[in-house]
Amino acid sequence: LGFVFIRFQAGPQPNIRHILRKFEEEVKQYELDKLLPSGDPFWQETVAANWKCVRDVDNEGYHVPLAHPGLHDLFGSNYYDEPLENGTNRSLGGFREGTNSLWSVKNYRSILSAKQTLDEAHKNAWLYIGVFPNMVLGLYPDSVIFYQEFPVENGKTIQRGASYRYAEEDRQMRLSRYLSMRIDRLTSKEDEQLIQWSWESAFSSAYDGVILSE
């Protein structure tokens, strides 16, 4: 798929290429082997919560309409998650029809310069592919991202990620990428609050011991 994965220790899991094989036809139109660094450094932050709280919030797309105004303005009711199967899951957010209301979303839609190798559906959608247990690839019409979490200790998690640009990026696509990253940054700040609430709820009298991120 264009990324290099290194196995540091032998284990029973199949290799990543095998795990992601079912997405090969859909993903090859993004030409991931031709991606270039965006110029932004890898980002990393420490989250004061158990890593499963972080993953639980990211896995559950049903909160998008209430918690993520930007994504809801972009997708409307067109966002859905597919269940985890054989170590991977897929989510797709198709851009909604009609006029957008938020500044970043409205301008993103109006100037979006999508990668020309994409079909019409993927020129108008954000695609996410998750790899169990802790990594997500985000495939956008204007760029590609990844992010992942690493548990440090109970109540402390490191989250890191990076963004990439398409080789043919011009000024308009670069501006599109800036706006999609702006939408993502706002979404990440909103997720921080959800993660905090999820972590704090585990210490409340109402917590019944449900297993997170099952």
Language-model segments: residues:
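C-terminal catalytic domain of Rieske-type non-heme iron oxygenases
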Residues: 2-214
